[in-house]
Amino acid sequence: MAELAEQKREEYKAHAPVFHRPKDGAREVHEPYLAALVEDGDNVTLVHEAADGHVDAFLVAMLFPAPPVYDPGGSTCSVDDFVVESPELWETAGRALLERAFAATRQRGAVQSVVVCGPQDEPKRTLLRSMGHDVASEWFTLPFGQPAVT
């Protein structure tokens, strides 16, 4: 899982180099963080294995209550750590992981999902749109002290 996440960080760094700049030793810090997510029974952690047995995709879903000013009717399934080894796996492994995570979190009271996806990650965005997701919010970043790109 940590290796796949590291690959995704490198990919995302090209799009937003300050926001996604990996810290020195990021993998060593991320491994225990991922382990804690896996061990937390409140989370839904799923992996997909390739035919040779190596992990080629993973997902961690967490349940969160809505902010106090909103009432969607239940909790939110938040999916931030969600990575596949190669773009063509989004439609197969990625879809399978999301479907399982959504089923598990709906049983726990989730009424909606929020899936983090970078604007440049078109294969992942295509999967999410094909499953009925819509963009509800976006983050715009500006590194201070550096010229804005227009």
Language model regions located:
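Conserved GNAT-fold acetyl-CoA-binding loop/helix
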Residues: R9-Y33
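Conserved beta-strand in the GNAT
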Residues: V47, H54-L63
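Conserved acetyl-CoA binding element of GNAT-fold acetyltransferases
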Residues: M62, P72-S86, E138-T141
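A short helix-loop-beta-strand connector motif used in the catalytic cores of GNAT acetyltransferases and
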Residues: E31-V47, S78
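Conserved active-site alpha-helix within GNAT-family acetyltransferase domains
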Residues: R95, E99, Q107, P119-S137
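Conserved GNAT acetyl-CoA-binding A-motif
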Residues: T105-C117
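Conserved acetyl-CoA-binding loop-helix of GNAT-fold acetyltransferases
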Residues: D81-V84, W90-A103, S130
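Conserved catalytic-core motifs of GNAT/GCN5-like acyltransferases
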Residues: A66, V116-G118, R129, D134-P147
